A protein has these predicted regions:
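Segments forming oxygen-rich coordination pockets for charged ligands
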Residues: 1-110, 117-119, 141-144, 186-188, ...
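Short glycine-rich anion-binding loops that position phosphate/pyrophosphate groups of nucleotides
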Residues: 23, 151-154, 176-177, 256-258
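Short glycine/serine/threonine-rich phosphate/pyrophosphate-binding segments
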Residues: 91-94, 154-159, 179-182, 264
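ADP-ribose/adenylate-binding Rossmann-like module
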Residues: 106-108, 145-152, 161-186
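Short, glycine/polar-rich helix-capping loops at beta-to-alpha or helix-loop-helix junctions
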Residues: 112-117, 155-158
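Conserved SAM-binding strand-loop segment of SAM-dependent methyltransferases
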Residues: 124-130
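Short amphipathic alpha-helix with an adjacent loop that forms part of the alpha/beta core around
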Residues: 132-142
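Adenosine-phosphate binding glycine-rich loop
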Residues: 174-242
């Protein structure tokens, strides 16, 4: 199962699993994809189907109680993507801080002079193109953090309408109250719901009173970090992943709960191979 988990993580950056902790199905595991429980054992399909709706509501790594059954639900995340639309003055420090925070950073602008390595030396990817081409140029990625800082509400709405149709972890949009209002009205007129539009952080950033580009960038980064750390999730340890990919047999040890202070949190893992070597 872990090889499959790592494969999905490479594709989407996020995956959910569940393991039964008690009862007749103790030890059974499943992957949860698009709110459906996927088990390699067809005999347990009906069992998992009963809990699909409740599993879909789980957003963090923890033990959950569903009737008489206890589950350990894990949310794995990897390689958070920071995708910035607009290559102006605010975008430059946002990209720099994003890289410092461990994000893979992409910057897109429809002006070639605004997406250069001189302006964005820390970016991993620079894209010049129309914002209407967003879906063609940037693959959907669940562990994605989108920052819309284009120069006008037409660019904002072009980006937002495409992002709202795909999975994401964070979507923020810069702008005055009037600019944000115009964009919301346009998107509502196109059929997007109030619930969808309320998921957009607009105006973007925490209210720290910033005015200079670097100050605004700090407020944006702070809000992104706040959202990123809102739930307990399981991060992939590189040593554990390498061992699982290379070794044929072994045992995975997982912390499912803890009390008091500890350097390792819930979801932390250690892999032990058949020769007794430990990783993680």
């Amino acid at each position: 199962m872990y090889r499959k988990i790592y494969q999905i993580l490479e594709e989407t950056g996020k995956v959910k699993t569940a393991m039964v902790l008690n009862g007749n199905h103790k030890g059974e595991k499943c992957l949860i994809k698009e709110n459906h429980c996927l088990s390699s054992d067809e005999n347990t399909a009906d069992f998992w189907k009963k809990y699909e709706a409740d599993m879909a509501e789980c957003q963090e790594t923890k033990v959950v109680h569903m009737g008489d059954v206890d589950f350990f639900v894990e949310i794995y995340v990897k390689n958070p993507q920071l995708i910035i639309f607009g290559g102006g003055h605010v975008s430059q420090p946002v990209a720099k801080i994003g890289k410092m925070l461990g994000f893979h950073v992409t910057v897109m602008d429809d002006r070639e002079d605004f997406v250069t390595s001189e302006r964005f030396p820390d970016a991993d990817r620079l894209i010049k193109g129309s914002y209407d081409e967003l879906s063609d140029k940037i693959p959907a990625y669940e562990n994605a953090y989108y920052v819309i800082v284009t120069r006008g509400h037409l660019g904002d709405s072009a980006c937002a309408r495409q992002i709202l149709r795909r999975p994401y972890t964070y979507l923020g949009m810069i702008g005055s109250k009037n600019k944000v209002k115009l964009t919301r009205e346009k998107l509502l007129g196109e059929g997007f719901s109030e619930e969808q539009l309320n998921s957009i952080h607009a105006p973007i950033g925490l209210p720290i009173g910033g005015h200079m580009p670097a100050e605004i960038a700090v407020s944006i980064a702070a809000e992104i970090v706040q959202e990123k750390n809102r739930y307990d999730v399981s991060y992939i340890d590189g040593a554990v992943e390498d061992a699982v990919r290379k070794k044929e047999n072994g045992i995975m040890i997982t912390i499912i709960s803890k009390s008091g202070s500890s350097p390792r949190g819930t979801g932390s893992k250690m892999f032990i191979d058949k020769d007794g070597n430990s990783y993680g």
